Amino acid sequence: MWIDCRTIARSIEERTKERVEKLGFTPKLVSVACTDDPSTLSYLKSQRKKAEKLGIAFEILNVSPEEIVSTLKKLGSDESVNGVFVARPFPPSFDEKEILSSVPVEKDVEGVNPANLGLLLYDEEIFPPCTAEAAVRILERETNLSGKRVTVVGRSVTVGKPLALMLLKKGRDATVTVCHSRTVNLEEITKNSDIVVVAVGRAHFLKKNMVKEGAIVIDVGINYVDGKLQGDVDPSVEEIARVTPVPGGVGQVTTALLFEHVVRAAERQRK
């Protein structure tokens, strides 16, 4: 069975639009890019369309790699800007941690600044990473997480690690296992899990024989195979489990949450 993520995304967007109307001013998101990567530029265009739909002002700043840190710092002091998004990939020679640390903490709507990530250790989710939060929102709609055995396959800073912390949070209380490329007996671990979240960047990585019947599977994968978008989960898994589709799954909820965070940032700054 496919999980209906579009309905979740629409619900988030409807609430976001209502909150925008109550603000009394137009919140603004600035996306900073130092890349000509076609998929990144396409995503930024989709951000613009979504912002217009929600009543949020939007601007794209194309800067040179050398200017990105100083640009992010300037946006931190610009009172007309409520949210800052920094587009990836970055040039290989540049320090990703330095760049992400320059995103203003109070405007870090994607939850990439190490300071915001660190708050997850204390169960504080002011601006959690959008993709990790999307996985949590979907799971909370599908099941009660307390005591559930959850396996997160992938240990990235943007998804795997923060998601594990969010699932462990008091009140959610999942029992979490994090697997990665060095994990032994991965199939045995996933097969004994109530929930499997896959974020490894390998098309159709999770096979039907790796999942128990009735499990929930969250597919965070974005892979292009012969020009078509494919997830990390093999389509056959849907025959025995509840699975988020790709496209139209986690990504839809992730984008909706990005703009929810813009409004949250605006509300906090107004105070």
UniProtKB/Swiss-Prot annotation:
Pathway linked to the protein: One-carbon metabolism; tetrahydrofolate interconversion
Subunit text: Homodimer.
Reactions this protein catalyses: (6R)-5,10-methylene-5,6,7,8-tetrahydrofolate + NADP(+) = (6R)-5,10-methenyltetrahydrofolate + NADPH; (6R)-5,10-methenyltetrahydrofolate + H2O = (6R)-10-formyltetrahydrofolate + H(+)
Keyword Oxidoreductase belongs to the record: yes
Coiled-coil regions listed in the entry: none
Physiological role: Catalyzes the oxidation of 5,10-methylenetetrahydrofolate to 5,10-methenyltetrahydrofolate and then the hydrolysis of 5,10-methenyltetrahydrofolate to 10-formyltetrahydrofolate.
Protein family per UniProt: Belongs to the tetrahydrofolate dehydrogenase/cyclohydrolase family.
EC number: 1.5.1.5, 3.5.4.9
Gene Ontology biological-process annotations: L-histidine biosynthetic process; methionine biosynthetic process; purine nucleotide biosynthetic process; tetrahydrofolate interconversion
Keyword Hydrolase recorded: yes
InterPro entries associated with the record: Aminoacid_DH-like_N_sf, NAD(P)-bd_dom_sf, THF_DH/CycHdrlase, THF_DH/CycHdrlase_cat_dom, THF_DH/CycHdrlase_NAD-bd_dom
Domain of life assignment: Bacteria
Binding residues for NADP(+): G154, R155, S156, S181, I222
Cellular compartments per GO CC: cytosol
Protein's UniProt name: Bifunctional protein FolD
GO molecular function: methenyltetrahydrofolate cyclohydrolase activity; methylenetetrahydrofolate dehydrogenase (NADP+) activity
UniProt keyword list: Amino-acid biosynthesis, Histidine biosynthesis, Hydrolase, Methionine biosynthesis, Multifunctional enzyme, NADP, One-carbon metabolism, Oxidoreductase, Purine biosynthesis
Pfam families, per database record: THF_DHG_CYH, THF_DHG_CYH_C
